[in-house]
Amino acid sequence: MKLVIDANIPAADACFGGVGTLHRLPGREIRATDLQNADALIVRSITQVNRALLANSPVRFVGTCTIGTDHIDLDYLKERNIGFASAPGCNAEAVVDYVLSSLLTVSEREGWPLLERTVGIVGAGNVGSRLQRRLKALGVAVRVCDPPRAEQEGASGFVSLDTLIDECDVICLHTPLVKAGPHATYQLLNAQRINELAPGTLLLNAGGGDCIDGLALRSRLAGKGDITAVLDVWEDEPGIDAGLRDLVALATPHIAGHSLDGKLRGTWMIQQALAAQLNQPSGMPFSELCPSPALATLTLQSALPVEEALRLCVRAVYDVRRDHDALQRQVMLQGIAKGFDSCRANYPLRREFATLTVYLENDAVSLQPSLQAAGFQVRCG
């Protein structure tokens, strides 16, 4: 059995080596000619899987080690009776880590208390729902907009997008890209809505790049300059708008979910799905794939202000500023598109908050609820 697999998918040998022969290729360079003798195709979000790619291939299974499926022509796979699996939720915790690191960074830079702000979450799926839980556990006021869920579950607990924009200091987008239909998200934040954002609003997009009108956002930032933006996803990746990149507070190259844990979880989920299709044993448990973290423990011996303690622990595991700086460096060296892709392809090892155990001594034990709410393991005494 021949498997064509994105070269940047981790633990490929451990998960798929026993299934067949692996043929590794850069995700953006996978072509139809590479699949002429392939039985399975394993990709990430940068590979467009459609009729043009698969038409003359014997591929019987496609797996994407990502939450989203925008890059997959699902109708064509169904037409050809090609098995398919994605990895919903595999990196959701990592994206929430990214959001918290970003919010703590911007709030420190601008001098406002995050825990006293109202945060709006647009899209309460795998990521948004986890972000909601962590923020509420921290005591942050949260508003949630998710029209499809509101239709299914009832309006209680949800608000409209316009209400969310009116009531929130921070707006986090975690919507998939839906181009048509009653709940389309393409340019969900269009020019009108961007112009309606209150001065001082922080807008963070870790959902879909096309969910925001980039030109309108650039105009608002370059003109009034009275809002702040954090962007991890962009229109026209990897050739993103250099002008917009220069205006946002934090610019990162679509890496919000790029924790080692999330990547391994995605690979493992696709391995499980392929094994099921082949009627083979499911293989090793996920826990055996995860190595021990380089930093496993941290000790706080005295109490700190809560947000200061959060920043200390968050940055011990993941500091979003490093990704922002790395993108700036690589763009200067290689240009926009190559620099963007280089950051993704050579992304440094990153773990999730849950891999760090924080030991609290003396009066630092008062920090236990907040640190646990943020996602860390906590031990007192």
Regions found by a protein language model. Give the residues of each.
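Rossmann-like adenosine-cofactor binding region
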Residues: V49, A150-A242
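N-terminal glycine-/charge-rich "phosphate-binding" loop or analogous flexible N-terminal tail
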Residues: M1-A38
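Oxidoreductase and adenylate-handling cofactor-binding alpha/beta cores
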Residues: V96-W112, A137-V140, T267-A276
